């Protein structure tokens, strides 16, 4: 038609975690995948995708009563946090189906208060829903080629757009 193509892009990936180490006491060390501020880790519930399915765990660090007074309110780096899945040793972690390299995500939660929705990764879902609605409304009303792109790897870099730009 001679009209330039138009692409609408929204990302659909999420931040997450990967198991870095499982210690003898059954505590799991993780690395972050994506831009996760460490100040929000303690007490967060995670789901790890293991060989036997999903395993729930909670991010933890040193107990408050065992932490020196000068350290009690400091934000701990992820290297000083652990995922507790209720295992007493590494063999119990293995029986749960977890191993180094397995991925984890924040446990999903959502609720509605009045006309406000609270949810994980709502920006991703809202972007994709908006593009879908917009394309439905303009279908057949333009001569240019329209593309909807649901990208991944946005949480890690701009790599998500490289294949799109090449196309």
Map each language-model feature to its residues.
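N-terminal hydrophobic/helix-forming segments and targeting peptides
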Residues: 1-167
């Amino acid at each position: 038609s001679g009209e330039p193509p138009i692409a609408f892009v929204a990302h659909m990936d999420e931040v997450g975690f990967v198991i870095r180490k499982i210690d003898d006491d059954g505590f799991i060390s993780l690395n972050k995948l994506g831009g996760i501020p460490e100040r929000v880790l303690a007490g967060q519930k995670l789901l790890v995708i293991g060989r036997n399915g999903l395993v729930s765990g909670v991010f933890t660090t040193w107990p408050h009563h065992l932490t020196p007074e000068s350290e009690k309110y400091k934000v701990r780096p992820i290297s000083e946090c652990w995922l507790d899945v209720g295992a007493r040793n590494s063999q119990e972690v293995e029986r749960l189906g977890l191993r180094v390299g397995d991925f984890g995500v924040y446990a999903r939660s959502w609720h509605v208060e009045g006309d406000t929705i609270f949810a994980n990764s709502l920006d991703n879902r809202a972007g994709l829903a908006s593009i879908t609605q917009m394309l439905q409304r303009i279908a057949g009303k333009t001569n240019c080629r329209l593309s909807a792109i649901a990208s991944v790897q946005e949480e890690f870099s701009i790599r998500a757009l490289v294949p799109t730009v090449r196309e």
